[in-house]
Amino acid sequence: MHDHDDEISNESENQTFADIVNARATRRTFLAGGAGVAALSFFGTAPAHATNPNKGPGNNSGKGKGADSGRIGFTSIPLNDGPLPTIAPEYAMSVILPWREKLDGSGESYPYDLTSEQQEKSVGLGHDGMWLFDDEVLCLNQEYGTNFHMFGRNDVRSLEEVRKVQAAHGVTVVALERVGDTYKVKRDRRNRRIHVNTPVEFSGPVAGTSFLTTKIDNHNPKGTVNNCSMGHTPWGTYVTCEENFDQYFGSKDKTWKATDEQKRMSIAGPDEGKEYAWFEYDERFDLAANPNEDQRFGWVVEIDPQKPNQKPIKRTALGRFKHEGATVVEGRGKRVVVYSGDDERNEYIYKFVSAGNWKSLQARGKSPLDEGVLYVAQFKEDGTGVWNELSPRNPKLAHKSLAWIMVNTRAAADIAGATKMDRPEWITVGQNEEMFCTLTNNNATNANPAKGEPGHRPANPAYTDAEGKPVANSDGHIIKWVDADGHTGTTFHWDFFAIAKEVKDENGQMFGSPDGIWADGKGRVFVETDGTQPGKNNDQLLVADQQTAEFK
């Protein structure tokens, strides 16, 4: 978790998720005895619970129904704060793709004081989302190699140092080969780095518009940055997501003022990007000297791992915000549906639905990620919801161009009436078309308007425990929903899958700050954490049974 995730730029009067949950609780006994009561209402699944980490597989100390189903029949291990990863005894681990490893298959690494040119030829820093394709080509995001990681200090002192940090960001594409029980990089023409200065293309409704016009490299856009989660398409490409791009922009001109649109995207002023301070040496990231460069970031970027000479393509029909994931699902009629969260407090959940069968679109020379409609989620207290269209066809947005809506997606979603969420993170599809979304947390507190502090309200829902006591939940939760019409419809039913404060074993609360999530299609849901854990322990990877909500 990073400080920029904890910003709030949403000043709209839209309802928060807590508003919805509280209203629902008023209508009926909601979450009495835990998240499972809500789950039973619409989905027929059992309450979230945990297994005893000190007993063998199949023993369950959690409340509610559901002995170990066999789907997650390994030994659960207790929380710990050790210096090295701890894993269940049924598994083994090995390290692959460390920072600085060369992409030539030699297995060697450049020194810690490598040059920017060497960094462009080696694995980047700050690993995040990834996908391993069937031919064992891996695409791996590098989200946030900081100055301290690179130099052991917080400042940069030259353009070369800026270039080195820039080269550590982006995506690594490598072909792997199995060696015993692990993998190694093999020499392959597809191996490459995609970084902040890699040439890129734009497609979709914003391509060719004045929104992307800059003074520097006007017709030669470059780069991807802060690559967090990801997705993959049915046609074999990788989609990577630009998240906290605001933290790289600023200005040496301290009189520069951010526009309202920039403030809505969390660029508050000339010192916004002072942590990295690229603008001190690279004029491209100085918004006084190079307006609109920020509007070239915040997109979903498509990469073809089989075509190393093809430019990455920024798909603007998917909207611009702090994308945390782009989960691509094949919906009814073989239309592709792309789900994304916007990872900042009080931001929204989105989905894009292609205009037609993806194979037919491609046969006509069109990208399924360019032709379609973007929607934003509005949750309702009765456990239903609607996807509000973000286009001029929506009467609330009729006065805006489609290009404006895609560049200023957050502002458009404000107007459309989206529900404020608790830092929406990764989204995954499980069995029976159920979608799952992690909401890390929302640690905002009610500010004091009398002191001039904005009255931001956390969207976190509280819940009532089995004894009927109200329990605050600042540790995040996981929701699930099912869309109408095989993912393509504009209505849905939603409910909780788990509330972090409630999932416990005999030692107490089991996890907090859920972040990454992936369902394997066999009834297992994998959840990784990123942030404060119970007892200040290490982050962790958990597995839950989709049907029983049992966690290990």
Task: Identify the function of each model-found stretch.
Residues 161-163, 167-169, 182-193, 347-412, ...:
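Beta-propeller fold recognition
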